[in-house]
Amino acid sequence: MSRIRQAFAALDGGKALIPYIAVGDPDIRTTLALMHGMVASGADILELGVPFSDPMADGPVIQRAAERALANGISLRDVLDVVRKFRETDTQTPVVLMGYLNPIHKMGYREFAQEAAKAGVDGVLTVDSPIETIDSLYRELKDNEVDCIFLIAPTTTEDRIKTIAELAGGFVYYVSLKGVTGAASLDTDEVSRKIEYLRQYIDIPIGVGFGISNAESARKIGRVAAAIIVGSRIVKEIENNAGNEAAAVGALVKELKDAVR
């Protein structure tokens, strides 16, 4: 059983908290401290952002984080190295990479999948990869027992949902809002209806991200989703608490986890 499946099974009906941070923001040492701190505070799965120069799906908060990481010279290989170091002391917590296809394409799909598996990566989500073009990467990830995680948006068609249901591993990431990450309004009733619809086709856990920023919104979404994915709010805590990032993020993660237990 994969680490992601084990993580969901261990919750015994509870809801997973999946926080997102950008690797290298503000630096590698802090990233590692944040990863361990978030796990200690209740995170069930970690989502690591791979910095990219044109993060079209991200709002301004995560864009700034990517810019800071890139200014530090962070590359995809550095991200894999961070996971490798994390695995020296944590062999249980699942780690998912989230980013754009370009850095993976440059490395080569086979090499990336092999190196990701060796480093201890459990899943990969590329936000700009249409299903029609992801077949090569999907095969390499599957051959190396790394889950290929897909986004589903409010506008995703039924045919595409059916295809995703056949290919997806680990969990499916439902984008609860149209637009970029960090958008403000979240219609929990609409999300609930959409999750119920998706469950007709998808038999792995469905996580919800985009727009979850506090305990109240996490609690509401946790009533219908298997996982709560929080990115912009976590990254904003890092941005606003220079020198005290781990403590600030740890407190927020604990608050969010307590809301969905």
From Swiss-Prot:
<keyword id="KW-0057">Aromatic amino acid biosynthesis</keyword>
<dbReference type="InterPro" id="IPR018204">
    <property type="entry name" value="Trp_synthase_alpha_AS"/>
</dbReference>
<feature type="active site" description="Proton acceptor">
    <location>
        <position position="58"/>
    </location>
</feature>
<dbReference type="InterPro" id="IPR002028">
    <property type="entry name" value="Trp_synthase_suA"/>
</dbReference>
<feature type="active site" description="Proton acceptor">
    <location>
        <position position="47"/>
    </location>
</feature>
<protein>
    <recommendedName>
        <fullName>Tryptophan synthase alpha chain</fullName>
        <ecNumber>4.2.1.20</ecNumber>
    </recommendedName>
</protein>
<dbReference type="InterPro" id="IPR011060">
    <property type="entry name" value="RibuloseP-bd_barrel"/>
</dbReference>
<comment type="function">
    <text>The alpha subunit is responsible for the aldol cleavage of indoleglycerol phosphate to indole and glyceraldehyde 3-phosphate.</text>
</comment>
<comment type="pathway">
    <text>Amino-acid biosynthesis; L-tryptophan biosynthesis; L-tryptophan from chorismate: step 5/5.</text>
</comment>
<keyword id="KW-0822">Tryptophan biosynthesis</keyword>
<comment type="similarity">
    <text>Belongs to the TrpA family.</text>
</comment>
<dbReference type="InterPro" id="IPR013785">
    <property type="entry name" value="Aldolase_TIM"/>
</dbReference>
<comment type="subunit">
    <text>Tetramer of two alpha and two beta chains.</text>
</comment>
<dbReference type="GO" id="GO:0005829">
    <property type="term" value="C:cytosol"/>
</dbReference>
<dbReference type="Pfam" id="PF00290">
    <property type="entry name" value="Trp_syntA"/>
</dbReference>
<dbReference type="GO" id="GO:0004834">
    <property type="term" value="F:tryptophan synthase activity"/>
</dbReference>
<keyword id="KW-0028">Amino-acid biosynthesis</keyword>
<keyword id="KW-0456">Lyase</keyword>
